[in-house]
Amino acid sequence: MKRLIAILFVGIVALAASGFCHAQFSKLSFGKYGVSSIRPESLRAVRGAVWIDVTNPMEGFTVSEIKGTVYKHGVAFVHGEASDVYIPSGSGRAVISGRASLSSSASLWDVLALIAFDPEDYSVDLSVRITLDSGETRVVSKTRMPVAALLKLI
């Protein structure tokens, strides 16, 4: 589960990077990651926070209006949204907190199946707003990004 959460975090930052033609975005790199907290909100929803070490060779930027859906075999599995996160210039630890809830088509048994997590089974829709420190802003959306491809970024 920790790995899936970190993959989604990388997906958010990678999506932000793809939204600009800035050559330095391709030089973003990710290091250690972990879960800061997970708190059940109900049987079908959790709140939590994750951290990841990021090396950002360009100006800092804010990722906001973060929303997404995880699909398992093409069927909506989890819906989520997260608070704004700032990725500073240089190296540092970025923390993102948010809420995730099972979609109506998912069962609690599906959550137990995460024990045998296979990234080939999952894809992600993400939408974010990116604001560079210089003030330039762009909204970027991607649909059905394979989780297996996001794994290659970690």
For every predicted segment, state its role.
Residues 1-4:
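Positively charged n-region of N-terminal signal peptides that target proteins for export
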Residues 8-16:
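Bacterial N-terminal signal peptides
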Residues 21-49:
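Low-complexity, acidic Ser/Thr/Pro/Gly-rich terminal tails and inter-domain linkers that flank the onset
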Residues 54-56:
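Short solvent-exposed capping/turn motifs at the termini of beta-strands
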Residues 59-67, 79-81:
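Short, hydrophobic/aromatic beta-strand segments
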Residues 70-72:
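Conserved aromatic beta-strand anchor motif in extracellular beta-sandwich/beta-rich domains
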Residues 74-110:
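Intrinsically disordered, low-complexity Pro/Gly/Ser/Thr-rich segments with frequent PxxP/GP/PP motifs
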Residues 104-154:
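Terminal connector regions
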